[in-house]
Amino acid sequence: MYLHLHPQNPQPRNIATITETLSSGGVIIYPTDTIYGLGCDIHQHKAIEKVCRIKNIDPRKAQLSFVCYDFSDMSRYVKTMPTPVYRMLRNHLPGPYTFILPASKEVPKLLKSKKDTVGLRIPDNLIARSIVKELGRPILSASLPGEMVEEYTDPEIIYENFGKLVDIVVNGGIGGMVPSTVIDCTGPTAVLVREGAGKWEYEEGTF
């Protein structure tokens, strides 16, 4: 299925169609504030495995992240969040960042790293957040497979390449070419893991 959604005013009917698909174990491709990504309900084990098959990766080694609606939503999946970390996140989210944080018991085992951490996002994208809000649960955030990122900015090309592998491709306009900036907040300091779309000028210091 190929669905058009208005970036600033996503149609509720189409959002409902997407969330119904996710609830039944479906996989989608959807826009974020960076690149288009693969997504599914984080509590649908088989859907996560399907995403990993599409990407040709081992689910237990994938270090997948997921999208939350807001800070209240995010806090359920974080074991501990010291005040300095919370303030730092508030200064950068919603935005093009993935923060690695200590995982709570609410995080499905398949999405936890060996260090019991998880990557979390609150993208500055109304479509992605509307899907999460309507679903009532976070959705997976995984990059599309392959090296040609520039081919994955146009949802029509994405549909041609991946339409048969997923249940829905969401057209939310032309996407970006640069993934999110990844910051590890599990140690005594914030560590830049991957430089991406989000500017990172935070002075590293102890939390």
Label every model-predicted segment:
Residues 1-207:
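Active-site-adjacent structural elements in enzyme catalytic cores
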